[in-house]
Each structure stands twice: as C-alpha cells, then as structure tokens.
Amino acid sequence: MKKNNQMKPDNVAKRLWAFFIVLTMCITVQPVVPAKAQEAVQTAARTIYTEFKHGNSIHSGDGSYGNPYNLFEDAYAAAGNGDEISILGSGAFLNAEAAEPFIFDKSVTVNGNGNTFSNRKGGFILNTDVTFKNITLRFSNRLHDAIFANGHKLVLEDVTCDSGFRYVDIFGGSLYENGKNMGDHPGSGAQILITGGGTNLGNIYAGSMNGTYDGKTQIVLAHVSGTQNGEIYASGAKEPYVNQGDWFSMQEPDPPAADGQYTVSGDVEISLTGSDTKQVYGVSENHAGKTFLTIDTDQSYTGTPGISKVGNLTVKGGGTFAPAALDSCTVRLEGASAIDLSQMETPQVHSIVSADSAGNRLILGKEQKLNVTDTITGALTFETLNGRNGKSGIAEYGHTYLELGRAADTAVSFIPTDGQAGMTLERTSSGNGEIWKTSELSGNEPVAVKNMTIKNPVLLANVSNIRNSDKSYYLDVEWQEIGRASC
C-alpha cells in the first residue's frame, strides 16, 4: 500500500508557523553582553575639572579642562562613581548656605594637583569610599571642621591644612546631632589611610562625634612627617562649643574632647609606618574592642611621646622604638627590632613576645627595673642604654633588671660591654615568677677611676727625637679610685 505524500492543510500551517518563529528569533536575538561588562562601559572613569574664578554664586562651566565648573558642588553633581574631580590653578570652592556638612555619596577621587580646596560647609561626611590627594584644605567654618569616614574608606594622600584656616580633624565614625547620624549610609569597617611627607592635620578619632560607632576602625599613617599632626584616639569625641555667629574669628576652636561614652564597638588598629604623631590613646578596659598599635620603622623612632591604654603594641621593621610613656600592655617584637624603655621612670608591661629566633632587643636604663606582670616568650636580648656593636651599654653589678610574674620560656641573652666582660645575667626563681639580675663583682674587674689629673700636661721634646729614639717619657698622673668597674 502506497503512502500518501500529500500534506494535510493543518500540517502545512503548523510547519509554516514554526518556520516563522525560527525566522523571527534569528532577526531579533542580539549578542548578549554580560551585565558587569555593560556596567563597566557605563561607569568608565572620567575627569571633571573645577576652578573657582567667577564668584561665590556663579554656576558656570561644563567640567571640561577649557571650561571648568566654577563651583565644586557643580563638579560633584556631574560626577559619578569612579570619576576624578580635578582642581585647577585657582583652586576649588564649596559654598555654604548653612552649617550642615557636605555629603559625599559617590566614590570619587578629588585631585588637588597641589592647589587649594576652600570649604565653607560644616565638614565632610562620607557615605561611600572617597580619596583626596595633593590638596591644601581651607576649612573656614568653625563648626565640626572635620572629615567623617562614617565607617567607609577615607584616603588622604599629601593632604594638609593651610595656615590661617581650621585644622581638620578626622573621624572613623560619623557626626551626630540630637542623637541622629547625619550620614545616610554608615559602614562598619572604617579605614583612614594617610600618606605624604608634608601632611599636617588635626586629631584622629576612631569613633564618632557626639555619638557611638558600631564597627571597627583601621588607622594607617605611612611616611607622614608633618610636625603639627595631632593625637590619635581609639574612641569618639564630644564637639566643643563654637560661636556660630563669629564667622570671621581667626582663633582656632578647641579640638573635640575624646570621650569614653562615645565607644567603638570593634577593634581599633593603628599603624605608624615611618610616621609621627603626638600621642596615642587607646580605649578603656570596659570597651568591647581592643586597641592594637603597630610601629613599623627601620631606624630609631622617638616620635610618639606616650601611649595610653593600648592593649597590644607591635614594633617591627628592624628599628628601635623609645616611647616616653607606656601603659601595661603586650609588647610584640618582630624583625630584629627593639623597644627602648629607658625614658620611663617605672616601666611595666604585661608581657613581651619575641616573634623571631633572634635579633629582637629590650633596652633599659642603667639603674632601671622592668616589671613584666606575665612573662617573656621567645628569644630576646637584653641590654642597657648606649650599647654598641651587639653589646650592652654599661650595667650595674648585682642589679635586678627584670621581674617576671611567670617564668620565661627561654633564657634572655645578654652580652656585656668590653669593660665588663665577665658580667652575666642570671635568672632566679621568685614565687611563681622569676627575677633576672646581673652577677656580683668578682674582684677581677678593671679598676674604675674618676678625677684623673695629668700634673705636667706640657711635654717639651723634639718630634724627630721622639720618633727616632727609644727614650721613655713619663707623665705624672693622679686619680681617685672608686672601686671595680660597675659604672
């Protein structure tokens, strides 16, 4: 039986309809561009220019290099995430109709190109990450003259404050007024990264002004050598009273007063890499977070007069750190570094951790004693002040230099100066801990003298006779012996 090859009308219609659908898809389907790629194209970084040349209220310019925006607020309004706002020769100007802070809600870079940035607003608040670089700040408003990271990343590269204007304080948290955060989108991981040799700023606070901060803060000063940099606090602060009607006053307002009630809930990490600051204040023990301070230097570093309530201090980089004051804390030494406590009257630390196999040093004054309430861990070398060539300075005989609450896990090394070659550092159990003291005088040490006088200091002789003769010349010398060399 033969098959009927003739199509039925309904089959023909179905096939024509299928062909039409396929044809339509071929015509309308476009190449698919990944969403991230589309976003990258749409947000390609641009440079927007601003230069203040035409008056406080003149909104002019188009943001090009040849026709920059006159006012900074117009340049910022035209910017998007990832863009750079570039300040040209006459500087930037941000006007103010009120004392509210200026809100940065776009992740931009403000490049001063070595020019000034004049601001009349009551500070800056970040709702996202922002970078300022190569700028001289001119903050005129005496009310909350600060930059608030608000839990975000704030980068300051070669940023300084101009003379005659406000010192700008830096906060990891935000600004609160009547209990309200003036920033709309607070973060919880503030980063304050400051670099630049000529940096001069006010104080740095890990927390907020007039309120608490729920998060952690990292503060990094890298190769900052400005002489006027302020103090670093691991808490928030209370805003000082400012007479807002006294706009033209040239008097610098009082800095915000660090206040323990304005807490930081997370840890505060402070790192000073070849940088200077006046003082570092940690948080009190009843705060949830801890304060970690790292000194990274390859040279003798005495830039910080005092450290208060810092729970953990790390010294690394191979240099020596000599604080004038230091609360009891855990000291960690890395990379053949040293901590010099000779400036302190009664030094005390919680513990010392020497993180390397050798090379880390503890330095004390000749008559000092260090109280370590816990213990020493790792290989550590002890020496007194003014040591040279891997040897200690002059030490006292029979003097207790270390008092530990718990026995150290390894011996503390000690290499005496050449004049005290037989001296040793001996450990002795004491209750649950131990003491380390130098050995007693043995009677074989070199004689120590004082008030030495040469009675006939003038010697008359021909130089050639002295050079070519085996004749001896004697000098009459008097001195006072004060015992064996223990000084």
Description of each model-found segment:
Residues 137, 144, 165-184, 205-214, ...:
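Acidic/polar low-complexity surface segments
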Residues 485-487:
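Conserved small/polar residues in nucleotide/adenosyl-binding loops
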Residues 110-112, 130-134, 153-162, 187-196, ...:
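All-beta strand scaffolds that present successive hydrophobic residues in beta-strands
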Residues 94-109, 116-156, 168, 172, ...:
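Extracellular beta-strand-rich solenoid/capping regions of secreted or surface-exposed proteins
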